[in-house]
């Protein structure tokens, strides 16, 4: 799978789930389940409910994503 197939959307964390998984409401209104990317996990970046995040998604499964950035 080529990296160009992925696309990024912005959203807000609305719920924290087990195993560093979060429920994120995207700016278009959809709610997806997202996990933290490896670099964020390695650098111990904490994500709390209400944080603005960027979610990287693949067109193959639009219900799951990967959190790649947390806005301050």
Curated annotation (Swiss-Prot):
Pfam families assigned to the protein according to its UniProt record, in alphabetical order: eIF-1a (PF01176)
UniProt keyword list: Cytoplasm, Initiation factor, Protein biosynthesis, RNA-binding, rRNA-binding
CDD domains: S1_IF1 (cd04451)
Annotated compartments: Cytoplasm
Coiled coil residues, start to end: none
UniProt keyword Nuclease present: no
A GO MF label: ribosome binding
Domain of life: Bacteria
InterPro entries: NA-bd_OB-fold, RNA-binding_domain_S1_IF1, S1_domain, TIF_IF1
Gene Ontology CC terms, in alphabetical order: cytosol
Ranges where the S1-like domain occurs: 1-72
Family label: Belongs to the IF-1 family.
Known role: One of the essential components for the initiation of protein synthesis. Stabilizes the binding of IF-2 and IF-3 on the 30S subunit to which N-formylmethionyl-tRNA(fMet) subsequently binds. Helps modulate mRNA selection, yielding the 30S pre-initiation complex (PIC). Upon addition of the 50S ribosomal subunit IF-1, IF-2 and IF-3 are released leaving the mature 70S translation initiation complex.
HAMAP family on file: IF_1
Subunit structure of this chain's protein: Component of the 30S ribosomal translation pre-initiation complex which assembles on the 30S ribosome in the order IF-2 and IF-3, IF-1 and N-formylmethionyl-tRNA(fMet); mRNA recruitment can occur at any time during PIC assembly.
NCBIfam families: infA
Protein name: Translation initiation factor IF-1
Annotated source species: Saccharophagus degradans (strain 2-40 / ATCC 43961 / DSM 17024)
Gene that produces this protein: infA
């Amino acid at each position: 799978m080529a990296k160009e197939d992925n696309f990024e959307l912005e959203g807000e964390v609305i719920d924290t789930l087990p195993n560093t998984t979060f429920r994120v409401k995207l700016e278009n209104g959809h709610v997806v389940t997202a996990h933290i990317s490896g670099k964020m996990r390695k650098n111990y970046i904490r994500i709390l409910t209400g944080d603005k995040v960027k979610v990287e998604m693949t067109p193959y499964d639009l219900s799951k994503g990967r959190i790649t950035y947390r806005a301050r």
